[in-house]
């Protein structure tokens, strides 16, 4: 993952399945050269990340030291804090995180780190019941006993163990945790029953889909990934949609909801980003929902207050787009994003005007792909 910290530094967050990865960062020197900074970070596995103050924070579900009488291990939430200026790192575990975080017995992970209104917002993603959660309080949290796994199976991010219940039993709701600071203590938990949980998915990665408008209103976007669960009891009935938390509020705006699928011709979003004001850039599926990000080759612009949705015009045909950059660069009210195609053309940077939803081709990139777009200024 390539992540720009403003216009000062570029981070290469190294993700390795199940183990540590070496993370490096870069700057521009006074001569215009990209140079690596001295410090390398060994950070543990992460499934989401974001910026809060002076830190880049990564997070994932982890095993803790807590066990029940049968040796079943409780889940927790593991954090890595990378202090950008000091080039130091530390790890922590979320207090009270993981097991029974929402009061329904399920363990959770987070999707995204959003700094807004002087607080830290993150989407809470319910993961189902661990073996520890299945056994907790004599099984009181198991709604559907036949969903408890009877043998080990799956692979990669879909692997499971005998005795756990994979996937949430509560697919028709979304939760956001609001923390007063980056210590991840004393959260305010807010719930909506108008959208399903809020995150983009690509295998084990959980992409941020909660973003603040310039006025501090937090918009919560849901692709409704629970639709693709194999058991209908774990499938959400809710379409891909948008909910809102007003700036400074401790609850969802009961009067606000937008049905993305009704406006898009039946397609959900994959992931999204804030551009400017209350404009958001949405990467849209055009071949139906999946948890691998495949077939998400359209872009749309959504304006929060007016609830307007427009597909972006001026991009290459969706059938020849193979990928977009992992996030846009915003400047002067426009979004810039890399586009890679399969028609033999070189990758290019496109400028998207949110007020018109029109894309214009800009720089051609002499490379095979474009991971991210940003701008760096010289840092001593």
Describe the residue ranges of each PLM region:
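Hydrophobic, glycine-enriched assembly/anchoring segments
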Residues: 323-326, 330, 339-380
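Repeated scaffold domains used in trafficking and secretory/extracellular systems
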Residues: 1-3, 41-54, 102-113, 199-210, ...
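Beta-propeller domains
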Residues: 170-177, 182-252, 258-260, 264-268
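Beta-propeller blade signature
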Residues: 24-27, 74-87, 136-185, 234-250, ...
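Short beta-strand elements that form the blades of beta-propeller/WD-repeat-like
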Residues: 6-17, 53-71, 118-127, 159-168, ...
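Beta-propeller fold detector
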Residues: 33-43, 86-103, 186-196, 252-262, ...
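Post-signal peptide N-terminal segment of secreted/secretory-pathway proteins
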Residues: 1-106
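Intrinsically disordered, low-complexity segments enriched in Gly and acidic/Ser/Thr residues
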Residues: 253-345
């Amino acid at each position: 993952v390539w992540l720009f910290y403003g216009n000062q530094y570029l981070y290469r967050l190294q993700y390795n399945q199940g183990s540590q990865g070496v993370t490096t960062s870069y700057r521009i020197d006074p001569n215009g050269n990209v140079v690596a900074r001295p410090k390398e970070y060994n950070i543990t596995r992460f499934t989401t990340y974001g910026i809060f103050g002076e830190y880049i924070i990564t997070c994932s579900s982890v095993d803790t030291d807590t066990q029940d009488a049968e040796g079943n291990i409780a889940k927790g939430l593991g954090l890595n804090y990378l202090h950008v200026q000091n080039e130091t790192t530390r790890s922590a575990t979320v207090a009270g995180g993981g097991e029974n975080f929402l009061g329904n017995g399920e363990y959770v992970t987070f999707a995204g780190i959003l700094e807004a209104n002087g607080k830290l917002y993150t989407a809470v993603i319910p993961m189902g019941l661990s073996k520890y959660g299945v056994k907790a309080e004599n099984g009181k949290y198991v709604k559907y006993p036949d969903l408890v796994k009877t043998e080990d199976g799956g692979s990669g991010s879909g692997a499971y163990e005998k005795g756990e219940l994979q996937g949430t039993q509560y697919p028709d709701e979304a939760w956001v945790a609001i923390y007063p600071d980056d210590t991840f203590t004393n959260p305010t938990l807010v719930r909506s029953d108008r959208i399903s949980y809020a995150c983009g998915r690509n295998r084990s990665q959980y992409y941020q889909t909660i973003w603040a408008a310039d006025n501090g209103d937090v918009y919560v976007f849901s692709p409704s990934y629970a639709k693709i669960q194999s058991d209908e009891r774990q499938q959400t009935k809710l379409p891909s949609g948008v909910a809102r938390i007003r700036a400074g509020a401790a609850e969802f705006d009961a009067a606000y909801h937008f049905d993305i699928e009704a406006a898009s011709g039946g397609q959900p979003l994959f992931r999204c980003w804030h551009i400017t004001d209350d404009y958001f850039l949405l990467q849209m599926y055009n071949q139906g929902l999946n948890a691998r990000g495949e077939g998400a080759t359209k872009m749309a612009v959504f304006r929060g207050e007016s609830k307007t949705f427009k597909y972006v015009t001026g991009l290459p045909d969706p059938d020849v787009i193979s990928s977009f950059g992992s996030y846009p660069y915003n400047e002067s009210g426009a979004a810039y994003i890399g586009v890679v195609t399969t028609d033999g053309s070189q990758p290019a940077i496109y400028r998207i005007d949110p007020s018109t939803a029109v894309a214009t081709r800009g720089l051609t990139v002499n490379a095979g792909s474009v991971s991210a777009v940003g701008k760096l200024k010289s840092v001593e």
